[in-house]
Amino acid sequence: MKAKVIEKAYFIFLLLLPFVHFSITVDPVLIPRQLYLASFLLLVIFLLYSQKDCHIIPVKKPLFLAIGSYLLLSIVSSYGNFTTESHYVLSKQLVIFSFLLITIHLLYNKILHIDYLIKGCIGIGIIALIGAYYHWIEKTIDGEKIFRRAGLVKSFFANKNLLASILFMCLPFFLIGLKQSKKVKIISIVGMLSAIPILILLGTRAVFLAIAVFGLLLLCYSLREKYGIRKRIFGLGSIVILVLMMFIYKNLVVPKAKDIATSKSTSAQYFYRIANSNTFISRTKFWDNSIAMWKEKPVMGVGAGNWQVEFPKYGLDKMNSFSIANGTETLQRPHNDFLNILCENGLLGLIVYCMIFGVIYYQLIFLIRNTKRSSEKWNFIYLLGGITGYVVISFFDFPMERIEHQILLMIFFAITTSSYYSRKELIQESKIRQSYFMYGFTAISLYALIVGGFRFKGEMETVKTYVAKAYERWDETLIHANKAENYFYKIDQTSIPIDWYKGMANSNLKEIDQSLVYFESAYHHAPYQIQVINNLASTYEFLGNRQKAIEFFQKAIQISTDFEEARLNLAAVYFNDKQYDKAFEVIDKMKINYTNKRYKQYLIPILEKKINAVLKQKNDMVLSRNLAKRITRSQHIYNIYIAAKKNNVSFETEILSMK
């Protein structure tokens, strides 16, 4: 009886997963779905407490050892730097792997049947598609050119790329569903056909590559099983042609992408979006910083959840993004899960994480070789293709961060491992009592609930903080920021410490001494966040601690040489300190900014001092008279400076040319 309840609970859990979406949090799905998963595990554990005849697979098996080692390394790598983000990442990983282990044992003990998981995952795919088509139709009715703004189609997920990857991960279940009942078969066919237009619209290249690898794997196996050597050669020839087509695309289509960027044609714009390599180039720069981060702590890494805090340390100006260089856009991940693990958990952590996949691959190959029924064998091939596609996507995106992606991946793993041990004769069961496992999983679920609950409340108040700050209601900003911060939540989803918002509020309320306390605390939590450093330096200057101000402005510029606010502020500090040459040197390295009013306001007085210094040094009356005739307004000084930049000469050279 309880087995049926658990099966239905799993099915309903999977169907409701996409609907767990709260607009009142910073990320509408991340924390809510962790809470949902932890609550579901508690329910399953409660239902299992009275299940006495549950056989436990020995914990010394390779998969369990690899998972345990990975989690242990995640904890050890964070030693000495265990932050609120470490709590979050660790709680998420613990609850996800607990879901895997419980599901494996439920399948192994026949308490849960695979069909319920298959149907539930098919349901996720169908619901995702319904949401995607709803967004497509809604935005089209609103007059949006949806092929140019495909990012508006997100369904129940955070962005279009995550939607595309979730549809890919449902593909193996759709294919397995073709061998199920007539109703499930029809739904699977509808799902696969409906996914094609959505995937084309989204244009997520990592998913296209994953689909290509998935199809290639299926093709290779099909050729191996069904055809003779000639047809295999023909098939391999087709693969070579496909590779050549990709080469042609890279070398002929991509270079011409700029030519169609300004085209008004919808199809041309779509192909430009697909061919545009700017996103990939940007990500390689993220990866460069990540490699530099790993080299500093190659064995154990910087600690779970700390990539986002450490990333700016390795330079932001090379990102080729104005918003990143100026700290208005921040990064939370390197868009490569394996690189993220390498940075946070070190080389040991990455090796152990890869071992988890290695064990699963070994089990799948064993199952494919030793399964006699063709339909069942193909099911394992679909799972193999799905896991391989996931690995491909993980090299260019961050499915590891997302609960829904991890649930589907863990279901891949659970089906594989339970099937593997069902075919292998276990010499002995685990000597650890079942109740101990239940206590452990209960503790993990409660830990995930506590961390998630505090972060959920923190994100709710952070959203209110954003709104109050945008409308410059500083009293409200301070109130909501105080409510947002707690033991498990000190940095928001944009990698900005909550104390920074408190500092901003106090600064605008003229409580400068208190703002300094909060900015120093924010700096402690995020020592390389340039907005935090800039505000801390400005506060030091306001309170008369000029040396500290200069030190921190220089640190901000060292991290991002193109950080305009810090350059302007440092130039102003040098100017006020009568270090005019240094003030000119700092502001002269800025790119000419025609929109920032402070740029011109600060530049002209510094240029006046520079002109006076040149005239005093040269002591040339002719030059002085000519400049006096040419410069009658401050705008004329600015024009001379612009001319020097256009002529690619120094400001002093431009002045001397006026003799």
Short names for language-model regions:
Residues K8-V20, L37-L47, G68-G80, Y88-H105, ...:
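Alpha-helical transmembrane segments of multi-pass inner-membrane proteins
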Residues T140-L152, V254-S282, D288-K295, A304-C343:
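Interfacial juxtamembrane loops and adjacent helix segments
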Residues Y487, I491, H525, I559, ...:
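Structural marker of alpha-solenoid helical repeat scaffolds
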Residues I491, S495, Q529, F563, ...:
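Residue-level recognition of tetratricopeptide repeat
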Residues W500-M504, Q531-E541, E565-A572:
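Conserved alpha-helical positions within TPR/SEL1-like repeat arrays
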